[in-house]
């Protein structure tokens, strides 16, 4: 399934085509063959996919390619901390999609607050740069699997 999701995302992003799973099998299989310099024909079929399924497949593909990631960081419960973390992400060219910040979990005002950030990256290298920037800023990031 994962290989079909990546093949689907490739077809949408690179060729602006919506192809259903039966048509994606050859595209996914070609990733495992040495076809460089050879003329290959892959028959693509079907576009019979509902919008909800398509959205889910695209999101799964973006997660697999490290284009969407979720990071948990611990911050102090004081004014300016949220801005500081957002600034670190912005300087690293990350784009915040969703933020989960709940300071009412603990009754101890001196306790750290967990901040869960879902963000966009350009791929694995960029994801690693963002995580490193958060580490360098003392945020102790932990990458967690995004939920859809």
Predicted features and spans:
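Short, surface-exposed loop/turn motifs that are enriched in glycine and acidic residues
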Residues: 15-19, 44, 74-75
């Amino acid at each position: 399934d994962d290989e079909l999701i990546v093949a689907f995302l490739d077809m949408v992003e690179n060729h602006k085509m919506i192809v259903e799973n039966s048509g994606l099998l050859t595209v996914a299989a070609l990733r495992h063959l040495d076809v460089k310099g050879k003329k290959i024909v892959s028959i693509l079929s079907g576009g019979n996919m509902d919008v909800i399924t398509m959205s889910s497949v695209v999101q799964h593909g973006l997660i697999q390619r490290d284009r969407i990631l979720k990071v948990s960081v611990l911050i102090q419960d004081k004014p300016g901390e949220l801005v500081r973390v957002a600034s670190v992400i912005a300087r690293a060219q990350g784009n915040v999609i969703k933020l989960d910040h709940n300071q009412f979990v603990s009754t101890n005002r001196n306790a750290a607050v967990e901040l869960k950030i879902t963000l966009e990256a350009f791929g694995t290298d960029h994801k690693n740069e963002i995580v490193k920037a958060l580490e360098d800023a003392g945020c102790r990031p932990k990458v967690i699997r995004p939920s859809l």
